[in-house]
Each structure stands twice: as structure tokens, then as C-alpha cells.
């Protein structure tokens, strides 16, 4: 028997499809999400409705974004969810979550078992809409969750950690073994909760500058910032901010990256493209 077939649907490798089928895990995730009637609930990648059904049972209305045409069609004819669903057969990477929040008249609560092959770029796409999002709950590769929650001075700490924590409070929820899926992925998974900050703990004047600094620093993470960011900051400027030029990218806190971004935004602002 082909272990990529689940409920009559062949999992597509190009979409990174692995279908959740462990009831205990499903119940735990739904409990963590705690959906309530009247909330603007949005699921990314509902697949075969493992989360859609138990979440939808608690709601009068649920919005789903599904790239796979066959799966979107299955949801349209779902025996009890169909009338509750608003289905966007679209790539979440190009979806405008701000427009949807405006249409629904409230911030979105976004959740999903995300395809692991696009999870990191999708996170960055969602970060650009955090003013339209109340919270997010995602199943991700465990290694990605580790990176999201990592602090300075750890191997997992990187650009994703800094940008996620700049935008959100990041909370790991539970770990999930490969056996909870069909077909089983080759990696462990985990569920994470991301809650956009109501008030930014480390406001920056231009988030594009923060993105640039973290990209340049972590692209050369083994170099000291005296070298990796030498084109942006002199040793004197770094020292003046209380940042040791001999530190590497992984030693610098989110607050310090934001401090550096604000200095650069004031003294060498990016030109509007």
C-alpha cells in the first residue's frame, strides 16, 4: 500500500504534504488554539481537514487558504463544514492577510499545519501583517520552532529568531512525533504560538534596516561583527552603543539589533525604492 495515500488523496511532494492523523495530537492543538464563535479564524493549508473539522465544529464561520485544487474542491463539498467555509484556493505566500482582516472587521487568528518546504518564507510573509493578526498557531518542523524561540549564544539563534521575536511573543506548545502523520515526515515536528506584540518592546524606525542588518550579520555568522557589519558600523559607533565589536551575530540580543537598526535609520537611511 502506498503510504503517501491518506483518505483517498495522494500526498503531493511538491506541496510538502504530510497529513496529521493522531487524534490526541489533534485534540491538543485545538485545545491550544481555543477557537471561539465570532472570531476571525483562518486556517492555512487545511489539507484533509484534520484540524478544520474540530475547529469548524466550534465556529459558525471559518476561512481556509488551500493551494491544492483537489483538496479545496473536497472542502467545498464537505458534508457538515461546507456551508461554514470561505475557501481561498490560493498560495498563502501571496495572500493579503491585511485585506482579509479589514473585510472581517477584526484581527485574524491564524493556524495551520504548514508545509515544511515553505514554512520559513511564509513566517516572514506573515510578519509583515502582524498589525492585522491577533495570534498564530502553527505545526512546524521542530528545528524551525527551536529557531523561532532561540535566544542569543545558541546555535539555533539566527535571523528568524530575531525577526520573530521583534514582531511576536513566541511560545512553544507541544512536540509531535513523525508517527502522527501520513506519510510520516523524516523529522520531528512541534506546535508554536506566536502572539504579535501589542506594544513593541524594541521599536525600530525602519524594519527594512533591521532586516538588512540581520541578513548581513547572520550570512557571515562566524565572523565578528567588526567584519560582517564593518560596511555599516565603525568600531567606535558599535562601542558607543555598548556593543562589543568582537562579538559574533549569535551573541547579539534582539534589543541590540534594534538599537543598531535605529542608529542606521537615523544616520544612513535606506532610499525609498
From Swiss-Prot:
Entry keyword Methyltransferase: yes
Localization: Cytoplasm
Cellular component GO terms, alphabetical: cytosol
Positions that bind S-adenosyl-L-methionine: 18, 20, 45, 66, 91, 113
Keyword Cell cycle: no
GO molecular function, one term: 16S rRNA (adenine(1518)-N(6)/adenine(1519)-N(6))-dimethyltransferase activity
Reactions accelerated catalytically: adenosine(1518)/adenosine(1519) in 16S rRNA + 4 S-adenosyl-L-methionine = N(6)-dimethyladenosine(1518)/N(6)-dimethyladenosine(1519) in 16S rRNA + 4 S-adenosyl-L-homocysteine + 4 H(+)
EC id: 2.1.1.182
Gene3D superfamilies: Ribosomal RNA adenine dimethylase-like, domain 2, Vaccinia Virus protein VP39
Keywords, in A-Z order: Cytoplasm, Methyltransferase, RNA-binding, rRNA processing, S-adenosyl-L-methionine, Transferase
Similarity section: Belongs to the class I-like SAM-binding methyltransferase superfamily. rRNA adenine N(6)-methyltransferase family. RsmA subfamily.
HAMAP family: 16SrRNA_methyltr_A (MF_00607)
Purpose: Specifically dimethylates two adjacent adenosines (A1518 and A1519) in the loop of a conserved hairpin near the 3'-end of 16S rRNA in the 30S particle. May play a critical role in biogenesis of 30S subunits.
The protein, known as: Ribosomal RNA small subunit methyltransferase A
Gene for this chain: rsmA
Amino acid at each position: 500500500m502506498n503510504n503517501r495515500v491518506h483518505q483517498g488523496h495522494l500526498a503531493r511532494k511538491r506541496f510538502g504534504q504530510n497529513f496529521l492523523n493522531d487524534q490526541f495530537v489533534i485534540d491538543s492543538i485545538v485545545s491550544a488554539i481555543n477557537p471561539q464563535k465570532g472570531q476571525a479564524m483562518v486556517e492555512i493549508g487545511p489539507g484533509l481537514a484534520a484540524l478544520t473539522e474540530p475547529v469548524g465544529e466550534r465556529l459558525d464561520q471559518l476561512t481556509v487558504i488551500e493551494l491544492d485544487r483537489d483538496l479545496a474542491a473536497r472542502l467545498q463539498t464537505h458534508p457538515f463544514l461546507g456551508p461554514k467555509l470561505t475557501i481561498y484556493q490560493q498560495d498563502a505566500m501571496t495572500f493579503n492577510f491585511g485585506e482579509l482582516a479589514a473585510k472581517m472587521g477584526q484581527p485574524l487568528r491564524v493556524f495551520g499545519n504548514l508545509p515544511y518546504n515553505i514554512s520559513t518564507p511564509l513566517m516572514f510573509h506573515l510578519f509583515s501583517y502582524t498589525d492585522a493578526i491577533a495570534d498564530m498557531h502553527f505545526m512546524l518542523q521542530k528545528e524551525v520552532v527551536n529557531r523561532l524561540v532561540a535566544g542569543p549564544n545558541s546555535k539555533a539563534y539566527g535571523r528568524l529568531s530575531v525577526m520573530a521575536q521583534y514582531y511576536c511573543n513566541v511560545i512553544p506548545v507541544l512536540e509531535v512525533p513523525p508517527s502522527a502523520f501520513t506519510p510520516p515526515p523524516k523529522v520531528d515536528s512541534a506546535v508554536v504560538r506566536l502572539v504579535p506584540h501589542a506594544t513593541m518592546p524594541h521599536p525600530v524606525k525602519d524594519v527594512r534596516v533591521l532586516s538588512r542588518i540581520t541578513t548581513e550579520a547572520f550570512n557571515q555568522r562566524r565572523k565578528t561583527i567588526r567584519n560582517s557589519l564593518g560596511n555599516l558600523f565603525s568600531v567606535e559607533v558599535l562601542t558607543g552603543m555598548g556593543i562589543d565589536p568582537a562579538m559574533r551575530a549569535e551573541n547579539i540580543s534582539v534589543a541590540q539589533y534594534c538599537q543598531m537598526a535605529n542608529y542606521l535609520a537615523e544616520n544612513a537611511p535606506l532610499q525609498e525604492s
